[in-house]
Design a protein with these regions (language model features):
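Conserved catalytic cores of phosphodiester-cleaving nucleases, focusing on short active-site segments
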Residues: 66, 77-81
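Basic, Lys/Arg-enriched alpha-helical interface segments
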Residues: 1-63, 72-75, 85-121
Length: 121
């Protein structure tokens, strides 16, 4: 099973969610660790395919989101966990999209530094 690597403040932010939200999103991350996809996980638009996923949960009128990538062989990288505050529909706010892009780059850098060269395992 792949480990979860938390980028930036995503772990602290995730742990601030209500327990029922943590449970549901935690299960989605567990499925990603085992190579499966939660039924509520959807590719995040703007990232070119199914490598960056978003899971959304509502709790007592508030909306919570976790964004993670399954692009890398060695880990599931949780890129961002946040409570959506914007009332402008379902679209992810631009400042959150920018943070996700920065953290995806950090995950890519981490992957490059820690990947096992092919044929050396």
């Amino acid at each position: 099973m792949k480990p979860v690597a938390w980028i930036g403040s995503s772990y602290k932010d995730f742990r601030s969610f209500p327990d029922p939200v943590q449970d549901g999103m935690g299960y989605a991350l567990f499925l990603a660790q085992t190579g499966k996809m939660h039924g509520d996980a959807k590719p995040l638009k703007g990232f070119g395919g199914a490598g960056v996923l978003e899971v959304v949960d509502d709790n007592q009128g508030d909306t919570y989101r976790a964004v993670y990538t399954v692009k890398f062989e060695e880990a599931v990288y949780d890129l961002h966990a946040f409570q959506k505050k914007s009332k402008q529909g379902r679209k992810t706010p631009p400042q959150d999209m920018e943070m996700i892009r920065r953290r995806l780059k950090a995950a890519e850098d981490h992957h490059r530094q820690h990947q096992t060269p092919r044929g050396s395992a």
